[in-house]
Swiss-Prot record:
Keywords assigned: DNA damage, DNA recombination, DNA repair, DNA replication, DNA-binding
Xref: InterPro entries: NA-bd_OB-fold, Primosome_PriB/ssb, ssDNA-bd
Chain intervals with Low complexity compositional bias: 112-128
Segments forming domain SSB: 1-104
Function in brief: Plays an important role in DNA replication, recombination and repair. Binds to ssDNA and to an array of partner proteins to recruit them to their sites of action during DNA metabolism.
Subunit structure: Homotetramer.
A single cellular component GO annotation: nucleoid
Region annotated Disordered, chain positions: 104-156
Encoding gene, per UniProt annotation: ssb
Any one GO BP annotation for this protein: DNA recombination
Motif range (Important for interaction with partner proteins): 151-156
This protein's name: Single-stranded DNA-binding protein
CDD domains membership: SSB_OBF
Pfam family, one: SSB
Length: 156
């Protein structure tokens, strides 16, 4: 039997860290994972998958990941159930993570946004041709008609 789940997605909220009665740290979060196909409107839908992680990895997740962080999760699928206050049986399916990869540095979303803003400010008011770089000559500019190539001239 095999129960293995590998996911890559973005956190939809900050992780929640708590400690069990026996003193074990547990972090939980939801991962948004894009589907590989588009719907009838041409939009890509996402699945929102609950993740739990234990012990030291739970501490690291809480410390280094936040809403919007890109993460890779390797774990197993688990379904548990409990009885709620109304006496109804509630089933919960989640991924119990064995390993979590932080796929971008903390606050990289902010850094990428800052870099984009700097680029916009630097190029604002400039034409794409006024960057004072020499334009490379087109070696085929004066070619009249098709260019003849021999197979022996190709590097592959």
């Amino acid at each position: 039997m095999l129960n293995r789940t590998i996911l890559v997605g973005r956190l939809t909220r900050d992780p929640e860290l708590r400690t069990t009665q026996s003193g074990v740290n547990v972090a939980s979060f939801t991962l948004a994972v894009n589907r590989t196909f588009t719907n009838a409107q041409g939009e890509r839908e996402a699945d929102f998958i609950n993740i739990i992680v234990f012990k030291k990895q739970a501490e690291n997740v809480n410390k280094y990941l936040s809403k919007g962080s890109l993460a890779g999760v390797d774990g197993r699928l688990q379904t548990r159930n409990y009885e709620n206050k109304e006496g109804q049986r509630v089933y919960v399916t989640e991924v119990v993570a064995d390993s979590i990869q932080f796929l971008e540095p903390k606050n990289s979303n902010d850094t990428q946004q800052d870099l984009y803003q700097q680029q916009v400010q630097q190029t604002r008011g400039q034409s794409q041709y006024s960057n004072n770089k020499p334009v490379k000559d087109n070696p085929f500019a004066n070619a009249n008609g098709p260019i003849e190539l021999n197979d022996d001239d190709l590097p592959f």
